[in-house]
């Protein structure tokens, strides 16, 4: 088996080695899993619900929500509404507790008769420490059928970028890949 490599000159071995390293590096950059239906009716009412931020990066949820709203509208989801928290009771817990804010948003979406809600969580949204400082993003998305509370589609993914890329740019690429099979008809 290794006798084949004896016939390759040193330049060829270096090229072969570099190709193998590049292939391994590129294949390790993105990990994605998806589950559920992928075609949704454009006539149904949609709401973008708050995300849970587990990343430790302040306001990462707001950034993801804005990028996601733009990508969904580009896919043809023209009737997408964005949930905005109304602090009528001057209660700070929903602002500080992502899970509680998400639960209250889902309840409000049900009362407002939305059919689908899209939400999720941010697991990672930062730059890796070290010389390169590459961006690293980890996201979970869920589409919830609001009247039933059933999760009808979900996706999770992680992506790392190169040193010159931004976290938002890497996040946008990951969101685009997560939504690649979703069709709005």
Regions found by a protein language model. Give the residues of each.
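N-terminal segment of the mature soluble domain
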Residues: 42-43, 50, 55-112, 150, ...
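C-terminal/domain-edge helix-coil "capping" segments
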Residues: 29-45, 65-66, 74, 108-112, ...
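Short, solvent-exposed loop/turn segments at secondary-structure junctions
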Residues: 55-56, 126-128
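Sec-dependent bacterial lipoprotein signal peptides
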Residues: 1-29
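Generic short beta-strand segments
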Residues: 121-125
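Mid-length scaffold segments of soluble, non-membrane domains
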Residues: 110-120
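Hydrophobic beta-strand positions
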Residues: 84, 143-144
């Amino acid at each position: 088996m290794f006798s084949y490599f004896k016939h390759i000159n040193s330049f060829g071995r270096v090229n072969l080695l570099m190709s193998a390293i590049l292939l391994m590096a590129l294949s390790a950059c993105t990990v994605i899993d998806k589950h559920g239906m992928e075609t949704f009716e454009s006539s149904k009412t949609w709401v973008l619900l708050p995300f849970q931020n587990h990343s430790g990066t302040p306001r990462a949820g707001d950034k993801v929500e804005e990028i996601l709203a733009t990508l969904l509208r580009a896919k043809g989801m023209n009737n997408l509404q964005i949930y905005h928290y109304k602090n009528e009771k001057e209660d700070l817990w929903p602002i500080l507790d992502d899970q509680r804010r998400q639960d209250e948003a889902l309840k409000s979406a049900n009362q407002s008769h939305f059919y689908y809600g899209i939400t999720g969580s941010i697991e990672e949204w930062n730059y890796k420490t070290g010389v390169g400082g590459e961006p690293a993003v980890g996201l979970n998305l869920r589409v919830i059928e609001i009247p039933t509370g059933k999760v009808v589609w979900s996706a999770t993914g992680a992506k790392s970028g190169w040193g010159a890329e931004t976290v938002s740019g890497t996040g946008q690429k990951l969101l685009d890949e997560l939504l690649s099979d979703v069709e709005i008809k």
